Amino acid sequence: ETLHCAHYQALNPVVSEGMVQMAMGTPAALYNGGLLQTHLFYFDPHRQRPGLPEHVAALVDRASNDSVRVHLVNTNPVEAVPVVLQAGAFGEHRFGEALFDANGLSQQVAVDGRHLRVDLGPAVSLVIELSLTRYAHRPSYGRPPQ
């Protein structure tokens, strides 16, 4: 029996491709069990787990070979929320510089590493343009330092 590459999508009622593409700036894994190749990956430092923290939304609206732009929003009107951005699903990429833009105010920061911690204030919307060197590090399942 020959199966189409989208065969497993018909069996699974949860389709996450759209969310993966919007939040991480990449198409979803090509087949069931394939490795995810992303520009960005997120960690929740409070819960010490992969993924976006509660009340945080992310949208990648531009991605290229050497940069990625992401919009981060903290929907919590009362509390600040930290989020850690990782360069690549396995930390295989390296961030060079980050250009932060919040309400027209810009700030450039040198990162030069796999991880960037961002503390989002209450009800804050932020745009970050990150320069990216692809495949600068050996891929790893390691987590960001606490």
What positions do the PLM features span?
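C-terminal beta-strand-rich structural cap/linker in extracellular carbohydrate-active enzymes
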Residues: 112-146
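Surface-exposed beta-strand/loop patches in extracellular or lumenal glycoproteins
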Residues: 76-91
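Composition- and surface-driven signal marking solvent-exposed, interaction-prone regions
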Residues: 82-86, 98, 141-145
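Beta-strand secondary-structure signal
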Residues: 69-71, 82-84, 117, 127-129
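A structural detector for beta-sheet-dominated domains
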Residues: 61-63, 73, 86-88, 101, ...
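C-terminal, active-site-flanking charged/polar segments
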Residues: 90-93, 123
